[in-house]
Amino acid sequence: MRETTLKEIADILGISVTTVSKALKNYPDVSEKTKKAVIDLAEKLHYIPNSFAVNLRTKESKTIGLIIPEVVHHFFSGVVNGIIDEAEKNGYLVIILQSNESLELEKKQVALLINKRVDGIIMSLSNESNNDVHIKDILDKEIPFVQFDKIAKLIPSSKVIINDRKAAQEAVQHLIDMGCKKIAHIRGLENPQNSIDRFMGYKMALEKNGIPFDPSLVYPCKAITFEQGVEFAKQILDEDKGIDGIFVITDLVAVGVLAHFNEVGVKVPEDISVIGFSNWLVSQVITPKLSTVEQPSYEMGVAAFDLLLEEMICHKEQKEFVPRTVELGTAVIARESTLRNK
């Protein structure tokens, strides 16, 4: 039979998990009425105290866990640097795990970090993550937790994000400002929230400029790879739909598009303009240089650790912590792949 959690008691009574925890420990700052309600419900639901959570509160490991989809990804490497720098300043070590965009591996890594008794966990979800049971396990065990970039919106944790819809809309608006009238979108995988939001931003830009949305101009990736970009570039040319601009989910795929266009003699941006997302280093060395959206990776890492530290301190001192979301800014970086003479 599944054990009752503190969160379930808190949800039923309409109070915070921290208040439930304090009530069960007879803290003086919790009213007698609340204590009685918590204790009565705990007995009714056969709640068993989580000895792991108790131990975690009384003994720090000075270690945090970080789960990211790809270590070699230019964006994620920047986030890692920000987290490590900030963690070191505050006396913490970071255990870095790579999910390889696999939900099953991600679940195992969450379980590993819980068993390692880390003081907190920072995480960007894999592309396969379509449920949040393993994430709820982190919250049920009262482990401080911060999400960044690819997130589960409904999970009540702190988050560090960008406004992907707004950023995508601005990228497509740039193509329109450069004279593009028939714009394709190479979109990301189905599950990630940032993929969904960038697709919505693409549609919003079209609508704002009176350009009809054509679903046949949307090319969904099966994988976020260079090869996928090459494949879609071939398909776009073979279909010959008159596309004059392409907004690509991320720079790695966009570079594949440019590579094929270069190979077959398509002039960029004269024939087709291309803009990516994330401002990878490779976007500055390919010919033509790739226009993109600057995503502040290092700053995202710093902000993620700072939020986690704030929660870890509250957790240690048994203070109420209210999760919050930090939104960082983005900017369109216009380079040779879009700067055409209108």
What are these regions (language model features)?
Residues 234-235, 239-342:
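Flexible loop/turn connectors
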